[in-house]
UniProtKB/Swiss-Prot annotation:
Organism for this UniProt entry: Macaca fascicularis
Protein name: Inactive polypeptide N-acetylgalactosaminyltransferase-like protein 5
Region described as Catalytic subdomain B: 301-363
Cysteine pairs bridged by disulfides in the record: 124-355, 346-422
Residues reported in the UniProt entry to bind substrate: 174, 204, 228, 332
Region (Catalytic subdomain A): 133-243
Gene that encodes the chain: GALNTL5
Amino acid sequence: MRNAIIRCLFYGSLTFGIWTALLFIYLHHNHVSNWQKKSHEPLSAWSPGKKVHQQIIYGSDQIPKPHVIVKRTDEDKAESTLGMDFNHTNPELHNELLKYGFNVIISRSLGIEREVPDTRNKMCLQKHYPARLPTASIVICFHNEEFHALFRTVSSVMNLTPHYFLEEIILVDDMSEVDDLKEKLDYHLETFRGKIKIIRNKKREGLIRARLIGASHASGDVLVILDSHCEVNRVWLEPLLHAIAKDPKMVVRPLIDVIDDRTLEYKPSPVVRGAFDWNLQFKWDNVFSYEMDGPEGPTKPIRSPAMSGGIFAIRRHYFNEIGQYDKDMDFWGGENLELSLRIWMCGGQLFIIPCSRVGHISKKQTRKTSAIISATIHNYLRLVHVWLDEYKEQFFLRKPGLKYVTYGNIHERVQLRKRLGCKSFQWYLDNVFPELEASVNRS
C-alpha cells in the first residue's frame, strides 16, 4: 500500500513537471514571435501611443522614420462618436457653448488626443515629397481656450508631423485667466520637452500682436500659423512645405475640414477657395471646374483670392520682408484680408493645397464685446484706406456710417506699399478676383 502511494506521488509530480515545462516553452515562443513581429514594424516620428504621456520623443539627430498610425481599440473609436445622441438641452452644455463656442462636455470626454479620419483624396496618397524640405515653426496663440481642445491641437501636430521638419511649436498665452492653462498645461507639455516654447504675455495683446510675438521667437524656415482649436490630419505639413520650397513667395493653406461645434465630429470639406464681398466679409467660394483639370485633378493647388486668418504657412523671411501684420490693428478681424491683398498685390501668390487637411472647430458665434466690435471696425478701415484705392467707395456705400470714423496713423503702411512696389487694387480685380468687380456692375 505504501509503495503504491509513493508511485502515485512520483508519477503525479512527473506529470506536473512535464506540463509546466510545456507551458513555459509555449509562452516563450509567443513572446519571441511578438518581439520579432514588433521589431519589423516601422515607427512613426513620434511613436504615438494611446496616451500622450506614453509617447517617446526622439531628438533631431534621429534617422527619419515613416508615418504609421497606431490602430485604436473599439473603446477609443467610440470616443470619436461621442455626442451623436447627446442631450443638447443640457443647461451645462448651453453655458459652456456661450463661454467657449463649442461642446466642452464632449471635448473633455475625448481627452487630449484622438485619431481623426483621413479625408484626403485618394490621389493624394500617391504623392511623394522630398526628404529635404524647409523646417517649420508652428505658432499657436490662445486666450482662455478650453484645455482639451488646445492640447489636441498640440498633440495632433506632434503625432502627425515628422520631427525632422518640425523646428518647434511656439505657444503664446495671451493673458489667459483659466487655471487649466497654467500649471496643468505646463505639466502636460513636459511630455514634449525640447520641441515646445511657451510665451506668456504680461498683458492682453490680442490675436494679431500675439502672433507677431510668436513669430519673433521662431527659428524655423517656415511659419505655420494654427488656431488653438484644430486637429491636423495625416501628412498635413509636407505638401505645404513642398509648395513653399518650390516658390518662396507662395503663401499656402490647407483645406479646412469642419469639426462640428455640437458633436465634435470631424467632417471632410469640399475643395473651395477663400473670397470676400464688398462688406469685407470673408466667405468660401466654389472652385471653377477647369482649375481641377489636368493630370493632378482635385489635388492641384488652387489659387485663392483671400484666406481666413487662422491657418496658413509662409516662409519666415518673406513674412518679415512684406511687413508681417499691421501691428496697429487690434485684437482680430480684417488682418486676414489685409495680408491676402498684400500678398497678391506685392508680388506673392496665395494657394490652397488640397492634399493638406486640417480640422477646425467651427465655433458658435459668441456675443462680441464692444471692444472687439470697435477693433474690427478699426482694422477694416485701415485695410480700406491703405489697399482699396478708389474702390474704397464701394465699402462706404455699404457702410456709410464708417466713412468718418478715425483709424489711426497709416503712414507707415502706405510707405510699405510704395517700398514693395505693390500693384493697384484694380490689378487685383483684373487678375486675381474679377468676380468681385463683376458684383459692382450687378449692384
